[in-house]
Amino acid sequence: MSQLIEEISRRRTFAIISHPDAGKTTLTEKFLLYGGAIAQAGVVKGKKNSRAATSDWMEIEKQRGISVTSSVMQFQYNGFCINILDTPGHQDFSEDTYRTLMAADSAVMVIDGAKGVEPQTRKLFKVCAMRHIPIFTFVNKMDREAKDPFDLLDEVERELGIETYAMNWPIGSGKDFQGVYDREKAELLFFSGISGKKRADKLEIDLYDPQVAQLLDSEEKHRQLIDDVELLSAGREMDMQAVRDGQLSPVFFGSALTNFGIEPFLEAFLKLTPPPLARTADCGVIDPFSPDFSAFVFKIQANMNKAHRDRLAFMRICSGKFERDAEYFHVQGNKKMRLSQPQQLMAAEREIVDEAYAGDVIGVFDPGIFSIGDTITVPGKKFRYSGIPTFAPEHFCRVSAKDSMKRKQFVKGTEQIAQEGAIQIFKVPGSGFEEVIVGVVGTLQFDVFQYRMKNEYGVELRMEMLPYEEIRLIDEYPGDLTDLNLGSDAELLEDYRGRSLLVFSSFWAIDFTCRRNPGLKVSEIVVAEG
């Protein structure tokens, strides 16, 4: 039991979220670099002479230099076992991103120092805030011209509604960026070396040391730094309970590309962020330190290894210890099973694991029995973890196979990719699945879907973008749904569960359609438990 407590206590499982190009994937790579998981940090943008970033594993990601699927990476650092959930940073992300946040115990929010809080940051922050998990802020790209640090703190508080506490303070920005002041240790960290591919050296020196003015090449800069730090000291105090409740975000400044502030951030973050949190199930709260194993499926990914045509279900372990070949119980399937090939991943690279603990993420071979949100327990326990949210799609496309002889592959491909949660599939009532309406949260998923159907299933698609922006469930209608009076701004659809829905070209069209059809009642599907 003491080993179980020790192993779980050293786990840290967190997601990294950001707006596109804020430097999230670069920061992830530097964490892996410091943890010894990789010897050289990859450069994200596609350059022929520089390898692709470790977390960007799908072929389309390597070509575009963006992350479009959520990767899972584990490494060891200073006695901690770290599980990073790397979410897509592209503007058009998917439900996969939201679901990945359900598996995290905390989040690192990466903000571009020049741009501040951007639209996608707000979306992802909202999902984290919904779960009340601790959120840590890393203000990146301080080696470029950036906003005033005080303005950035104000912006985070104003835009996101969370209080902030600066853990360190930048020394200059842009060409003048020379390091950070660590408030907890009350010392300056000067960094030498600008190569993003090597670990940065650091020089520690007291803030009031006369040498600081010489190192900064200016007494004025030294005085400004002292004034800033003293002003911070007169402000809000650090409150760990507020951090744990997701009400206060510790803020760190640095530069992922040039390594400024990365290692101090990682060390402080690991001390502040919590070990695996308790999770809510239908029988109550499950303690992560319980000896009984339990987990839930938060992601399904097909064809991670094209040669094997495999499908992996990613499970977040919530309590106890997992042991390879032990007998477990699939609650939704109501049957016992052995998970004989459990794998831990570094993006697309995998290795078989014999044991894993609460906080860890493992991938298990899925012949098609798992669904997102499923619970796995030890035999004799039949509780279910709270469902994983599904989010209403915002973009729609009519899709069919160009070659009608590829019908079987088309149906299989669309169903498998939909089961992963990247797309949602609808059809016109009474029709088959030879032609479907695909709904997504972000339009990049259309490109990914088209690419994967061709690359993995050998099916070229005919795709017609539809003008719809809103979707509603039909709750009530006194007549036959096929007799609905619909104009060109609405269409009747059916989902895989057989539920009837309407899609609309605008928010205004919803009210107009309801008025044209007395007795019609519809409702939003903003967040539904999956």
Q: Predicted segment positions?
A:
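Structural and coupling elements of P-loop NTPases
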Residues: 1-530
